């Protein structure tokens, strides 16, 4: 069977749904975003409102859950466990985040690393992951947890920020983070749905942890632009929002060896290949 329902059609939904449709899947999904509904219906996605998630589940033999957790864990499992049990669903993919690892002061983390969440969202993500894993074990449903690094793609990227003058170069010594291109997310999830054999936890992250400054320097270089002077993190941290400060206070290098073993090489192994591709597409449009 090739019926997949995506609960929570968010920012990566067009890329993901396009890839699934091209692979011959019947794609269903839930969102109340009208503009997104219109776009996705045009490529063949059957879209349900959030009030009809139960109907969306019953169409599927595979589920992808992107809905963020609440204070009690996974909202979908808490609310719709009966519908999932009564459906033909035999595999669930859950999109989590590498933020569950917390701060490792620049050290490397892998799927077996101890989780050190401090903020409520990260703590709730850990609860949600465990909800899914326990549910899968209890009802013999394969569950695969994908911990995503920072997502970028043709719409959300530093090149667009540079063009729209919304970028502020910040430097913090020894600070690393990983990212993942939305096309790589779509490719991996397509393979996971097609195989329907994997379970457990996997980091969905690129090969090269890097500082924000390294990424910006490369972006300005390929655009042949001069980068403005950077600001030291210590000089601006007190002015940051709590969300932005959280990003800078968490520091880790994510190992993606398991990802490559299970799903092969990435389309965009590092930010360099990804930004080159994005900038080329911008040039083609201009």
Annotated model-derived regions:
Residues 13-14:
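N-terminal Rossmann-fold NAD(P) dinucleotide-binding loop
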Residues 34-83:
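NAD(P)H-binding glycine-rich loop region in Rossmannoid oxidoreductase-like domains
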Residues 50-51, 246-286:
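C-terminal amphipathic/interface module of NAD(P)-dependent oxidoreductases
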Residues 81-120:
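Conserved Rossmann-fold NAD(P)-dependent oxidoreductase catalytic core, especially the SDR/UDP-sugar
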Residues 126, 139-141, 151-164, 192-202, ...:
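Glycine/proline-rich active-site loop of Rossmann-fold NAD(P)-dependent oxidoreductases
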Residues 161-180, 184, 188:
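A conserved pocket-lining segment of Rossmann-fold NAD(P)-dependent short-chain dehydrogenase/reductase
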Residues 195-243:
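Mid/C-terminal beta-alpha module of Rossmann-like enzyme folds, strongest
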């Amino acid at each position: 069977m090739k019926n997949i329902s995506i609960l929570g059609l968010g920012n990566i939904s067009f890329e993901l749904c396009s890839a699934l449709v091209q692979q011959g899947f019947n794609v269903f999904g839930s969102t109340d975003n009208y503009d997104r509904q219109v776009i996705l219906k045009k490529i063949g996605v059957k879209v349900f409102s959030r009030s009809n998630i139960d109907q969306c589940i019953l169409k599927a033999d595979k589920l992808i859950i992107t809905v963020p957790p609440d204070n009690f864990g996974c909202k979908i499992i808490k609310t719709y466990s009966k519908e999932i049990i009564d459906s033909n669903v035999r595999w669930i993919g859950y999109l989590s985040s590498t933020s569950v690892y917390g701060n490792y002061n620049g050290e490397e983390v892998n799927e077996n690393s101890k989780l050190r969440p401090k903020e409520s969202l990260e703590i709730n993500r850990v609860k949600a992951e465990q909800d899914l894993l326990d549910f899968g074990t209890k009802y013999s449903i394969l569950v695969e947890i994908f911990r995503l690094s920072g997502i970028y793609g043709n719409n959300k990227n530093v090149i667009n920020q540079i063009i729209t003058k919304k970028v502020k170069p910040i430097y913090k010594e020894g600070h690393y983070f990983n990212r993942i291109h939305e096309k790589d997310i779509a490719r991996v999830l397509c393979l996971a749905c097609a195989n329907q054999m994997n379970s457990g936890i996997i980091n969905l992250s690129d090969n090269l942890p890097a500082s924000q400054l390294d990424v910006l320097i490369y972006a300005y270089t390929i655009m042949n632009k001069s980068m403005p002077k950077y600001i030291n993190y210590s000089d601006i941290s007190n002015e940051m929002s709590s969300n932005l400060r959280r990003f800078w206070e968490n520091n880790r290098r994510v190992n993606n060896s398991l990802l490559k073993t299970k799903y092969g090489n990435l389309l965009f192994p590092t930010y360099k290949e990804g930004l080159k591709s994005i900038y080329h597409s911008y040039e083609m449009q201009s």
